[in-house]
Amino acid sequence: MNFRSTRSDECVSPSYALLHGLAADGGLYVPESFPENVLSYKDLAGKSYQDIAEAVLSHFFTNFTAEERKQMIASAYNDTTFRDDRIVPLHSIDTDLSIAELFHGRTLAFKDLALSLFTYLLTAAKKQEKEDRDILILTATSGDTGKAALEGFKDVPGTNIMVFYPSEGVSPMQKQQMQKQEGDNVKVSAIYGNFDDAQSFLKRVFTSAEVNAYANEKGVLFSSANSINIGRLFPKVASSQDRKSVV
């Protein structure tokens, strides 16, 4: 499975798309083709969160072996990273209604579901691509993504992360969570403006030939932990499938 930019015919490997986040032309990376065998909710019913994640990822991250994917999933979703080993506990209200608890991750936000796995996907992609530059993750947030991304990437070797948030656009708790984040490789910065302003600024950085050339001279590669990155998107799809599989 390869990925292509929405703005050109450029095709890249899943690892390349994971590392770069956004295509050089500003387009999003999307699957070159979609699998014909669509996942059936009936087939997923009763399976563990980890099994559902593997069922989704196996269609799109074919650059990794099944064993590699399962190891990453096991490292991301366990009773150390989540307070409940079911990851997303489901409670049936009646035959047609269930409640999914999305708050058992390290930051109490549902963003933990995707970002816990993204860390391992990005690290594996860096190794597979033989990328020797340090990764600098630049991420915009309106609150929950920032803390979850910081927590996921804290103290990861060869990776640094900087989160930008609107100074007046997050809750006091979210601001404290980000500002007090532990880790030697994490930074946060408040901006004047809203989330869209932060996101637009980062997209200009990602697509600036001059800025990227300067970063390359310093041995740095920019990446993103926002949903523009397939490593954030497909784990999110897996969490959606988990909730739907009980219907």
What spans do the regions from the language model cover?
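PLP-dependent amino-acid enzyme catalytic core
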Residues: 1-247
